[in-house]
Amino acid sequence: MSLTGWFIGMQNSTYPLAVSMAVNAVNIVCSLCFVFAMRLGFIGIPLGTLAAQWCGFILSAFFAARMMRKETLGYAPRIDEMLRGLGRFFSVNRDIFLRSLCVMAVMLFFTATGARSGNMTLAVNALFMQLYLLYSHFMDGFAYAGEALVGKYAGAADKHSLRRCVSHLFAWGWSLAAIFAFAYGVFNHEVMSLFSDKPEVVAFAAAYRWWIALAPIAGMAAFIWDGVFVGLTATRQMLLSLAGATAVYFAIYFLSPFPDANSSLWTAFLTYLAVRGVILWLCFARKNEY
């Protein structure tokens, strides 16, 4: 994972893709061999995963060495510079760790609350979350691009290119969000049928289809800004935005006027996504150096 982040930071997405494909291929082949050919049973599955992870590590190390041979080191950093850099490194990791805790709290509460509303609601919410995750995988591509490009322009103090990059990211983000929102809202029955063969679940999902249709619109800015702020290493603002959005999430849920608990839950979740984007936009707008 560390080398994957480094590759993306160096604006090389080809190597992470190759490593990911190799890991999955080795995992499938080794698991089949261990389980069926060698008759190890379920023990063969983790062994296949272990072999795949080692393959991924070796391949990543090879790619990293290959890239580093092409890089020219300008100078050897002094001890005090290394210590300052290490302190900054741990500070960034602390902020991201605390931010992740907030995300986990929101998602755990969402799942637990949906479960208390009945099996049908739990099933529909689980499927809707799969749709949201599908959308998030597409948006992560723009976020990763933002991390690398914004980091490059921020390091070069090129404000014009940085702002132009952010504008382009949002243009692509809005376009993708509109496509997913249209598909989830208008073709909800067809989309849900791809994820469930239970007619009653698909029919029940129709009553809440506009919640999942609004999710791409509400969450788009949060994805883009996350990539931008990672590129700026402005993790403190990311933490504060997530903490503020989490507080709003719980407040909206418990104060919501909806008699339907699931509608209150989705109102809180969509507001949480939107607030994240708004807070980060305000942080970006206030920083003159950006």
Each language-model region and where it sits:
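Short loop-to-helix capping motifs
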Residues: 12-13, 41, 119, 198, ...
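Helix-terminus/linker motif at the lipid-water interface of multi-pass membrane proteins
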Residues: 30-40, 101-134, 152-153, 190-199
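Hydrophobic faces of transmembrane alpha-helices in multi-pass small-molecule transporters and flippases
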Residues: 10, 14-21, 59-62, 78-109, ...
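Generic structural marker for isolated residues within well-ordered, non-membrane alpha-helices
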Residues: 4, 31, 110, 188, ...
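Short runs within selected transmembrane alpha-helices of multi-pass transporters and secretion channels
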Residues: 1-9, 16-24, 45-61, 140-143, ...
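Hydrophobic alpha-helical transmembrane segments in multi-pass integral membrane proteins
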Residues: 249-255
